[in-house]
Amino acid sequence: HVASVMDRLLSQAEERFGIRRQEIAPQTVFVSHETYTPARGGSAAAEIASLRQSFGEAANRVVIANTKGFTGHSMGVGIEDVVAVKALEHGIVPPIANYDDDFEPDPDLGDLNLSRGGQYPVQYALRLGAGFGSQIAMTLTRQIAGVGERIDRTVHNRWVADVAGYD
């Protein structure tokens, strides 16, 4: 179940990096995998339960983003990975599609923090990817402040030439 995967990931991150889930919740964007298919069960119920189980009361402080309302269901989850990384890079989280003043969210969402789009103080991105046959992958990515150029172009070009077999 998604909840056990999320809880295990966060527990490992807490142990390895000394973070605390309740403390990082206000700085976390959860990029949902929800397919907007509640009539077929969707994944919303599992994701809601996972956030609440893993973060407790702090779940309402995690900002939730989703791309499928804009892109449909792609054959891979790469779009969502890019959204997560770009949200960390720029501090801008895309809105939930059609989430405006007339939007009536599912009552099961309660007080969960659905993104209206814009600036959010995100430092962590929690990403769920799921596939047919109960394949589940989840990542927790942390923003690392840039300190100028990360790649030495001369070294990179030399490596590319070496790999490609050119002088």
Predicted regions, residues:
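Conserved catalytic cysteine-centered active-site region
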Residues: 48-80
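Conserved beta-strand-centric core segments of catalytic alpha/beta enzyme folds
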Residues: 74-167
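A glycine-rich phosphate-binding loop feature that marks nucleotide/adenosyl-phosphate handling sites
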Residues: 26-33, 100-105
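Phosphate/pyrophosphate-binding loops at sites that engage ATP/ADP/AMP, CoA/4′-phosphopantetheine
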Residues: 5-29, 54-61
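Generic hydrophobic alpha-helical scaffold/packing signal
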Residues: 7-10, 48, 52, 82-85
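A glycine- and small-aliphatic-rich helix-loop capping segment at beta-alpha/alpha-beta transitions
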Residues: 44-55, 143-148
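Extended hydrophobic secondary-structure segments that form protein cores and membrane-embedded regions
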Residues: 28-33, 64-68, 127
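Active-site pocket-shaping loop/turn-to-helix segments
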Residues: 1-19, 36-46, 71-76
